[in-house]
Amino acid sequence: MNLDQYLPVLLFILVGVGVGILPMVLGRLLGPVRPDSEKNSPYECGFEAFEDARMKFDVRYYLVAILFILFDLEIAFLFPWAVSLKEIGALGFWSVMVFLGILVVGFVYEWKKGALDWE
């Protein structure tokens, strides 16, 4: 096995890591260190923190995120199908129609269950 072919990949990885780490190291070594109470205090958008930063999130945020990922992933399956529609013929067309039908049924089910309501 010839490992000379992997040298550009290794070089690319090393340069990428160096570009990411080198500015942080240089900033830490060469930057001025003048801590004071204002710099060390927690803030939110320039204001003092109103409450604990570790507040609980509503479950609906996670539900909407999962639903977004689910229906966004559908598009990832539709792009290759649309590109190769002429080659796959009627069987490919109808199989994707069944796939989309299942997704529509799932979407209607979520809508009827109230997963998309914010009240």
Curated annotation (Swiss-Prot):
EC top class named in words: translocase
Give the Pfam families listed for this entry. Answer: Oxidored_q4
Q: Name one GO molecular function term.
A: quinone binding
To which protein family does this belong? Belongs to the complex I subunit 3 family.
Membrane topology of this protein: Multi-pass membrane protein
Q: What is this protein called?
A: NADH-quinone oxidoreductase subunit A
Instruction: Spell out the subcellular localization from the entry.
Output: Cell inner membrane
Q: Does the keyword Methyltransferase apply?
A: no
Mark the transmembrane ranges: 7-27, 63-83, 88-108
Does the record bear Translocase in its keywords? yes
Where is this protein primarily located? Answer: membrane
Gene3D superfamilies according to UniProt? NADH:ubiquinone/plastoquinone oxidoreductase, chain 3
Q: How does it assemble?
A: NDH-1 is composed of 14 different subunits. Subunits NuoA, H, J, K, L, M, N constitute the membrane sector of the complex.
Q: Which GO terms describe its cellular component?
A: NADH dehydrogenase complex; plasma membrane
Q: What does this protein do?
A: NDH-1 shuttles electrons from NADH, via FMN and iron-sulfur (Fe-S) centers, to quinones in the respiratory chain. The immediate electron acceptor for the enzyme in this species is believed to be ubiquinone. Couples the redox reaction to proton translocation (for every two electrons transferred, four hydrogen ions are translocated across the cytoplasmic membrane), and thus conserves the redox energy in a proton gradient.
Question: Which EC numbers does the record give?
Answer: 7.1.1.-
Listed A to Z, the keywords are: Cell inner membrane, Cell membrane, Membrane, NAD, Quinone, Translocase, Transmembrane, Transmembrane helix, Transport, Ubiquinone
| Chain's gene name | nuoA
| Catalytic reactions on record | a quinone + NADH + 5 H(+)(in) = a quinol + NAD(+) + 4 H(+)(out)
